[in-house]
Amino acid sequence: MAAKEVRFHTDAREKMLRGVDILANAVKVTLGPKGRNVVLDKSFGAPRITKDGVTVAKEVELEDKFENMGAQMVREVASKTSDIAGDGTTTATVLAQAIVKEGAKAVASGMNPMDLKRGIDKAVDAIVEELKTNARRVTKNDEIAQVGTISANGDIEIGRFLAEAVEKVGNEGVITVEEAKTAVTELEVVEGMQFDRGYLSPYFVTNPDKMRVELEEPYLLIHEKKLSNLQALLPVLESVVQSGKPLLIIAEDVEGEALATPVVNKLRGGLKIAAVKAPGFGDRRKAMLEDIAILTGGTAISEDLGIKLENVTLNMLGRAKKVVVEKENTTIVDGAGSKSEIQGRVAQIRAQIEETTSDYDREKLQERLAKLAGGVAVIRVGGSTEVEVKERKDRVDDAMHATRAAVEEGVLPGGGVALLRAVKALDSIRTENADQKHGIEIVRRALEAPVRQIAENAGAEGSIIVGKLREKTEFGFGWNAQTNEFGDLYDQGVIDPVKVVRTALQDAASVAGLLITTEAMVAEKPKKDAPLPPMPGGGMDF
């Protein structure tokens, strides 16, 4: 086992604080509409330019093990805030640095770290309640656009695209962000349910120009297993032919004569038909087929239910207004399933999302929920160069999460003003313990940090801006760094989601509390490289 180095008390905290400062100073330059860029070196390809706090934080790795521990703790603040709220990572980092700095000074002067932490926790709880009390619900589309614009560092186009996406797919819908192949940013909305499986044979194509199958008011045969035997399929095919409607077969696979016969039928013009593979794998495939069945009002044909293919009747098949099958995607528009059954299925998936502990499972369940309840919107981010596209995509990701959070819990005045105004909630906290009182004061001072940093990044003097804001008492009155004007931030469209502000403060205080109460640090001693062997002398034979 390698030897360890141990640091105690002030020595440990100083090292840790240096690491916190290095990471926080690199991250906080990105805060606000006039935030600066950070260039990240990549071992391959061009350097990456970003204004995204968590992306910068993830790149910082320090040589000194003790300093690195401090930096990694603050990186955890940024990552956790990003995971929960999707934005506010830079604000969380700035708050954590401010609380840790003041807290370390207090501990060095002989105060009790545990009481300081209790005071900080009390203050944070009071501030969070104050923020929730002053929240405004988001109802209008232009308010969603404002949140997106602020989060995307003042990019109005991104805000507009996000508002349009939320309007079309709802808050349950999935919004995905991809890199475009062109310089133009565009939004594509997929109505209905789409899954990533295309036609099994190009002979099914009905629209040769676009190379896709378009079926109007088709029946859907949803089968869990492989289809290879034509005899079992014949009764269903005959019933569908008599009805005069098209047919879409969704099965694990369709092969042999079960595929050849529909192809021949289609070519002879007897029956409009298409076959696709079922989406997903294993248990997830079963669940997705059940989703399709509920959406279209059909039955998922499964041997588990004791239903044989030869006994299937027309009323067991699903119905939809339209189905479009492309080379790699199938879209079912306006399924004929009953509203109550779809809502029941949605509630069931929501319950599974609450219960699951796996991030991967949660993501897949969210996708299924969106396909049933909302729709799918794809924002394709364009730019002149790869570096620009990546930087813009980072901002679109942030803005997307911020708009979701705004619809969930409402909004507050932006620009760090909400935290500054919420300070009055600290006046009502009663405690006899002097160290706890100091913990509350630490939070009071730290809440100014975001406003100061936004001002400094915009080239203004932080203390003057804070002083002017203190002169007015209205909750929405603040400073717009983009236009360098004072006024009502709600009217100017400078707003932040409650969830983002709240999460940033809670995560910052949580990690700062741990750092303040740290008394010892243990790290592996750096290994000294063994000396190289002496060079062989001249004329020596080997």
Curated annotation (Swiss-Prot):
It holds the Pfam family Cpn60_TCP1. It catalyses: ATP + H2O + a folded polypeptide = ADP + phosphate + an unfolded polypeptide. SUPFAM superfamilies: GroEL apical domain-like, GroEL equatorial domain-like, GroEL-intermediate domain like. GO terms for cellular component: cytoplasm. It is found in: Cytoplasm. Its EC number is 5.6.1.7. It is an enzyme of class 5 (isomerase). It comes from the Bacteria. Its main location: cytoplasm. ATP binds at residues 30-33, 51, 87-91, 415, 496. Keywords: ATP-binding, Chaperone, Cytoplasm, Isomerase, Nucleotide-binding, Plasmid. GO terms for molecular function: ATP binding; ATP-dependent protein folding chaperone; isomerase activity; unfolded protein binding. One of its GO terms (biological process) is protein refolding. InterPro entries: Chaperonin_Cpn60_CS (IPR018370), Cpn60/GroEL (IPR001844), Cpn60/GroEL/TCP-1 (IPR002423), GroEL-like_apical_dom_sf (IPR027409), GROEL-like_equatorial_sf (IPR027413), TCP-1-like_intermed_sf (IPR027410). HAMAP family: CH60 (MF_00600). Forms a cylinder of 14 subunits composed of two heptameric rings stacked back-to-back. Interacts with the co-chaperonin GroES. Belongs to the chaperonin (HSP60) family. Together with its co-chaperonin GroES, plays an essential role in assisting protein folding. The GroEL-GroES system forms a nano-cage that allows encapsulation of the non-native substrate proteins and provides a physical environment optimized to promote and accelerate protein folding. This is Chaperonin GroEL 1. It comes from Sinorhizobium fredii (strain NBRC 101917 / NGR234). The gene is groEL1.
